[in-house]
Amino acid sequence: MARIHARRRGKSGSKRIYRDSPPEWVDMSPEEVEKKVLELYNEGYEPSMIGMILRDRYGIPSVKQVTGKKIQKILKEHGVEIKYPEDLKALIKKALKLRAHLEVHRKDKHNRRGLQLIEAKIWRLSSYYKEKGVLPADWKYNPDRLKIEISK
């Protein structure tokens, strides 16, 4: 696969080993893993970071193998509402930081171009999430409104 806004190939990465049951070294029960996921979310971690913490600190290679559910589903079952998908939220935060930079440094042409590329990714991703029903159909990218919502 190639990159969206660059003329180069992507990076190859390692593949996860196929297994249909949790490894024998995992000593936490599914209930304990769910409790740990909620605890980490309440500490302020995003779902991807929760998975990395569980992998690195607790030796759980995959939450889905242990519990049978993804982290998002565990959070949803316990009444946690995630307003924006994590990848979209990260792009919005990046765009807002770049806008703040461009307010101070108005002639920074290179970063103005970078902002255009980031916002193109946001529009592309938001149209995908609108099709899938994750975002409302009338949702629009408005940086001024999102600055307030994302900062909460």
Swiss-Prot record:
GO cellular component: cytosolic small ribosomal subunit
PANTHER family, alphabetized: RIBOSOMAL PROTEIN S15P/S13E (PTHR11885), SMALL RIBOSOMAL SUBUNIT PROTEIN US15 (PTHR11885:SF6)
Family according to the record: Belongs to the universal ribosomal protein uS15 family.
Subunit text: Part of the 30S ribosomal subunit.
Protein name from the UniProt record: Small ribosomal subunit protein uS15
Matches recorded under InterPro entries: Ribosomal_uS15, Ribosomal_uS15_arc_euk, Ribosomal_uS15_N, uS15_NS1_RNA-bd_sf
Record keyword Disulfide bond present: no
Gene3D superfamilies: 4.10.860.130, S15/NS1, RNA-binding
Record has Ribonucleoprotein as a keyword: yes
Ranges of Basic residues composition bias in the record: 1-16
Any GO BP: translation
Region (Disordered): 1-21
